[in-house]
Amino acid sequence: MKLIRTIRLDASDTFVFARAAEPTEWAVSGAFVFWNADVEKLEGKARSAFRSGFLGVESLGWSTLVQIVEATDADRAALVERLAQQLVAHFGAPDIASARAAAEEEVAFAESLCNHPTDTLIAVHRTFEDGAVREAFRTLHPRGDRKPMRAFSFLEVEGEEEPADEVNLVALAKNKRAGS
């Protein structure tokens, strides 16, 4: 079986998110964190977590990327149990049985993302459309036979149907100088 773990290729997650997940934590999508939030009003690091974060189950921190890894039945059971504990302690689940059922669904969804080779990286892009959260996932495959451990060492990206957010740094710099 395969599950997803957080991966940190550089230090950017520590700047992008209020709390960055630790590398190699078991992860889930984390969209449930925003169920009661007014996502249209999120700003800054909270908005970044909503738009592009996977939730590290142990730290409840966020990771831009997750890696598909091999897992055992015991790993999966421990992940479900830890997420259930976190749902009770931090997200208002009424009891461990209810939390376990919700955790099972979250882990099953994470598992459904793993229909790619081991070591494939996955990124998420979340939006809020027509009153619902929408998630789109992109996969990054390593070049050649090397494992993906360095930033920018990827060749193939799947799931590029969504338009990318673009920032024109040159125009921003010119506008800043003109306005100064």
Give, region by region, the residue ranges found by the protein language model:
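Soluble, non-transmembrane alpha-helical interaction regions
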Residues: 74-75, 93-95, 112-124
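Short, surface-exposed acidic
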Residues: 89-104
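Short acidic alpha-helix initiation/capping motifs at coil-to-helix transition points
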Residues: 75-83
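N-terminal accessory interaction module
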Residues: 1-62, 152-173
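Extended, non-catalytic structural segments that build the interaction scaffolds
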Residues: 61-73
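Amphipathic alpha-helical segments that form the core helices of the histone-fold
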Residues: 100-114
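Acidic, proline/glycine-rich low-complexity IDRs
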Residues: 115-180
